[in-house]
């Protein structure tokens, strides 16, 4: 019996000690608002940086974001592999009735509360807990203490990073990789999203923003070679969502035309998805009035489509309004989110938006990757934002936490899928065999 228990201990130790994969350095880019067709085959001809990356690595047809196709929900989905109703970051604007605290797209101090962030553990926290060195640049949330942990370094987002900020972040990250100071570097860049909002997804301004990113990425491939990192660094580039055209003043739904705003306890967000908390005793009245409004759908929480993986979120409101593509919901026209244009006044019209049904074509994002663990010149089928996490865990050599991603959708892009498969705890089959053997 002593020999059996000794053998059992050895089996358990060996099974727990299996590595997740080869442990290489990982550089991650989150390019906000980058729609999948911005790098179509035709578009790549005028984007030498992206074209080189595609030829050297993997490009998926498109990436489907989580619902709602907004930034913060997908920032967390990408870094946890979990749907919004699981990680609890369900919007850019949230309200917790129990504490009367609000999350307002990261601009208020209450947005830094663990209340919003501790619903799941993002990859950068897992790596930091594993004694990996994590450097983050402008990444929303890196300044927050999550589950009692902060990354090694966080250059906090305060204003929209410039193209020079972006280039400097890339250069600095590569220097930290070269010196051995970093295991993971994550860089966030927003300008493509900003220009897409202000001028529209097909505008010259959005195209110029993309070309500026392309130039930096072209230099990046050269800098990797100069620092002799090409055999030890994987690079992954993805976006949180796409962008579609909107037409202000033509396709606006003003709630004050249908209901009394005094009958609402709270309203969060404007645009494709709006959250309403009716005042006590007003739920049915508001719901029935809004059911008749064209170009949008009003859902009671329990009736939200299951395919959105949204309704179980703890911060989801009693009523959720979802606009048809291109339509914009607001309390009234005066509260439309104008932006400060060249006049110095907040009077600029928004011409692009996102947040709509995540299955719509214009909401699709991108995923690119290259490096020693990825196939070269490989085109992959579409993936979903929940799938990205497992890829990052695999090439970083870390065991993924339980998640909603599909390994089968991403395994094709890796050179050695067997050694790159996410590590797991001992399987039920192995444990069952051990138990049967002990009882024999």
Curated annotation (Swiss-Prot):
CDD domains xref list: Enpp (cd16018)
Glycosylation (residues): 100, 118, 341, 404
Enzyme Commission number, as recorded: 3.1.4.-, 3.1.4.38
GO MF term list: glycerophosphocholine cholinephosphodiesterase activity; glycerophosphodiester phosphodiesterase activity; metal ion binding; phosphoric diester hydrolase activity
GO biological process entries: choline metabolic process; lipid catabolic process; lipid metabolic process
Bilayer disposition of the protein: Lipid-anchor; GPI-anchor
Disulfide bond entries: 142-154
Primary location recorded for the protein, binned into one broad class: membrane
Record keywords, A-Z: Cell membrane, Disulfide bond, Glycoprotein, GPI-anchor, Hydrolase, Lipid degradation, Lipid metabolism, Lipoprotein, Membrane, Metal-binding, Phosphoprotein, Signal, Zinc
Compartments, as annotated in UniProt: Cell membrane
Lipid metabolism recorded as keyword: yes
GO CC annotations on file: extracellular region; plasma membrane; side of membrane
Propeptide residue interval(s): 420-440
Keyword flag Lipid metabolism: yes
Names of required cofactors: Zn(2+)
Sequence positions that bind Zn(2+) 1: 32, 71, 240-241
Positions contributing to Zn(2+) 2 binding: 193, 197, 354
Lipid tethering residues (GPI-anchor amidated serine): 419
Modified residues (Phosphoserine): 71
Activity regulation comment: Inhibited by EDTA and EGTA in vitro.
Signal peptide: 1-22
Family (UniProt): Belongs to the nucleotide pyrophosphatase/phosphodiesterase family.
Quaternary context: Homodimer; disulfide-linked. Homotetramer.
Protein name (database record): Glycerophosphocholine cholinephosphodiesterase ENPP6
């Amino acid at each position: 019996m002593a020999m059996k228990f000794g053998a059992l201990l050895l089996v358990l130790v060996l099974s727990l000690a299996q590595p997740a994969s080869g442990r290489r350095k990982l550089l991650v880019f989150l390019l906000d608002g980058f729609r999948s067709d911005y790098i179509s085959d035709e578009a790549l001809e005028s984007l030498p940086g992206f074209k080189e990356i595609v030829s050297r690595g993997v490009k998926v047809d498109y990436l489907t974001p989580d619902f709602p196709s907004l930034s913060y929900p997908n920032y967390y989905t990408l870094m946890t592999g979990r749907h919004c109703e699981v990680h609890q970051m369900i919007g850019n604007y949230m309200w917790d009735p129990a504490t009367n605290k609000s999350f307002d797209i990261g601009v208020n101090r209450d947005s830094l509360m663990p209340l919003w962030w501790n619903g799941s553990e993002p990859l950068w926290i897992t790596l930091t807990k594993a004694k990996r060195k994590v450097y983050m640049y402008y990444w929303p949330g890196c300044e927050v203490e999550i589950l009692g942990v902060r990354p090694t370094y966080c250059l906090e987002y305060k204003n929209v990073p410039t193209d020079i900020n972006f280039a400097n972040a890339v250069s600095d990250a590569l220097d930290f990789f070269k010196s051995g100071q970093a295991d993971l570097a994550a860089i966030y860049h927003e300008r493509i999203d900003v220009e897409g909002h202000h001028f529209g997804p097909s505008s010259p301004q959005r195209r110029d923003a993309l070309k500026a990113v392309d130039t930096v990425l072209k230099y990046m491939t050269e800098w990797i070679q100069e620092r002799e990192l090409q055999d030890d660094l994987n690079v992954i580039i993805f976006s949180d969502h796409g962008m579609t055209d909107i037409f202000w003043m033509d396709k606006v739904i003003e709630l004050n035309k249908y209901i009394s705003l005094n009958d609402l306890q709270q309203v969060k967000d404007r645009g494709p998805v709006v959250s309403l908390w009716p005042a006590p005793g007003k739920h049915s009245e508001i719901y029935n009035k809004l059911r008749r409004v064209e170009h949008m759908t009003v859902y009671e929480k329990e009736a939200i489509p299951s395919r959105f993986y949204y309704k179980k979120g703890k911060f989801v409101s009693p009523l959720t309004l979802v606009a048809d593509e291109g339509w914009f919901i607001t309390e009234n026209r005066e509260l439309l989110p104008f932006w400060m244009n060249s006049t110095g006044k907040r009077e600029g019209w928004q011409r692009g938006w996102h947040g709509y049904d995540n299955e719509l074509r214009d909401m699709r994002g991108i995923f690119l990757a290259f490096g020693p663990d990825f196939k070269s010149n490989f085109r992959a089928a579409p993936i979903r934002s929940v799938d990205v996490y497992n890829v990052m865990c695999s090439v970083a050599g870390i065991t993924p936490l339980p998640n909603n991603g599909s390994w089968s959708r991403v395994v094709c892009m890796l050179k050695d899928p067997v050694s790159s498969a996410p590590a797991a705890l001992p399987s039920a089959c192995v444990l069952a065999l051990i138990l049967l053997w002990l009882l024999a």
